[in-house]
């Protein structure tokens, strides 16, 4: 039916002009990908197009040819349709050769076509939109906005603004946080917040699409505490206008039973199918859960049990309380006018109404690292393979130590990969990375493998750590200085785009560090670190046990004869 409607009413110059304007904006706003991603993206089409047209081919919309379009539509008949469905409970009659699973193929019956024609859905062609040339007057880069500055502050709202130092300002990024302590207070609020987020996203899809056609990507998603963050990326000229409209939609939002049921099903399906996700994703989730790092502080069973009891009125009651406690936290980067930004912050606070949260709120972290202790989480999963993540957490909240961990991992990571992946072939994923866990510096080592011996994997990690400590003492000062220079050169290079340029500031804004100095402080600590600093730090952990160990182990349930790692089973 819809194909017929398209043929009769959808092939119009107005719809073509909408597509053409959308593609022109997308081409003008083209952002280059990192080198490897760009290479993979371009080579996928290299046999179909001339190399000179590989990028622009997706955006070229030159001539409207109704006859050509109708000719293509005429070939799209119901009889030629192919339907693909993926699900855990489908009947199969053919096994896959190189993977676990199977499939079936069946003909679509004539009765199916007849039933589909009886559909009660009302189909219609969307009205063509006029995508106007909305370039606003340019704003000059202001000297005082190289780093974020507070441009507005009042009860229940604050706004920070910085100006790009490397780009024209045609593109910007805008972050709007609707912040309250309520979502993370208890399990019921956490569930209500998640349901509301999904409901709001589902209900406003057309709005996101309308913004996207005008060169603005919009990502409404929760932060680690379950609070809604509206993130805008793309053309600067209309971002504030769309942001105001979205805040108004949030303020006015009411849900119906159907939207609630859809949201509940999405979350139920996610958690019920969680064990089938990639092992790397499960390792991340169980790591957070082991140390109670938001948002993953509740077990899957707790979440599923709570979800099954929830009703629409529970979400409505939560939203009413939430609306009365929102602190509006705003950060923008690009070339927004400070005056326009102040007015936007003030108007947005008025849209949301009064609040009991006058000052910025950030979660108080009561996590403690206890030297010489270990936490283990052992999980049996249905999918094949095993995974282990072994984390060494330093027992002091120190940005200096974290900076030194960055140097250590720059030396450690390739050696760890070469030793356990290339030489010993213990897994198909072998990696390490530095991070901050609840503000404590940490180094994590990850192995994902078909090897079923978790005891052996953990012992290999321990042996590697001892070997690396000995090798570190023999590394030359020249190698250390070269490693530091490589890290600093990477940090100081011109960012690929405005979103990378603002990334460090966005991180500080989310953490409540309104000095916005984390990146610069890390650079200073890296530059001043010596070989002796690194050796002493590494030895204090490896030989003196100045750390807390977090160990997460996953293995397929069918491997009954394969043991999890335990300290008691350590070989001499």
Which residue stretches match the model-derived regions?
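C-terminal regions of mature proteins
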Residues: 14-166, 283-370, 376-382, 395, ...
